[in-house]
Amino acid sequence: MRVKIISDSTCDLSPALLERYDIAVTPLCVIKDGKDFHDGVDITPVDIFAHVDGGGDLCSTSAVSQYEYGEMFARYANEYDAVVQITIGANFSCCYQNACAAAQEYENVFVVDSENLSTGQGLLVVAAAKLAEQGLSGAEIAERVRALAPKVEASFLIERLDYMRKGGRCSAVAALGANLLHLKPCIEVRNGKMAVCKKYRGSFEKCIRQYVKERLDGREDIAPELAFITHAAADANVVAAAKEEAAQYGSFE
């Protein structure tokens, strides 16, 4: 049984992992200065940060279209016994709806709503790829991944609210106050939606250590096979602190 795993680019998996598990990617569209780019193809997060930090407007995104999903499915549906497409959470984008519409033309294409984004979605994509290596059918993989989706724990800490202010998600006054008070909001994905679960205070490295400890300390419900430490051009010392803290609570892949 040969099953092709496809994911939206929002899974944020490294090129090495994509190659290791032979995962195909459907890139979202990134709109910068009125021009369309494909996420991970001709524009990267580093490009976006450099653009905005240089005074440019905040970039926006648009979903993978039904036509683009259809092209991807046409490429693999005949070559493989089945195709499993894992999308960004349906509450974050219309990618899932577009993929479902495109999949109606195929009996062997299965679409899964990850209920997540970034490497929360990435965890499910890797899980699906491992199941494909074990020889499970497309239907079985889709069923297993749908069952895993609510069990994924994905959260992140925001160092500064500048980007949220530019995106209209908080006022300039709120952003200034949070930055002055060194407040670091923790955003958690719950039931397919994002919500603020806690606010930390202090240096980013200190907050990261406390955050990781609270996420992992005393937990007996965590699968040790794989965990992702995901960051957007964070300081190397902060990334090292997160890894060091996480290593105290298990030997993750």
Enumerate the predicted regions with their spans:
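Short beta->alpha junction loops
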Residues: 63, 114-115
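Glycine-rich phosphate- or other oxyanion-binding loops that anchor nucleotides, phosphorylated ligands
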Residues: 55-57, 63-90, 97-98, 142, ...
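Short, contiguous strand/loop micro-motifs
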Residues: 1, 59-60, 86, 229-230
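Short coil/turn segments at beta-strand junctions that form active-site/ligand-binding loops
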Residues: 1, 80-82, 223-225
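Mixed-charge interfacial surface used for oligomerization/domain docking
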Residues: 4, 10-24, 28-29, 95-110, ...
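Short beta-strand segments
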Residues: 7, 85-89, 112-113
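N-terminal glycine-rich anion-binding loop in soluble enzyme alpha/beta folds
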Residues: 4-65
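Hydrophobic residues in alpha-helical segments
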Residues: 52-53, 77, 132, 165
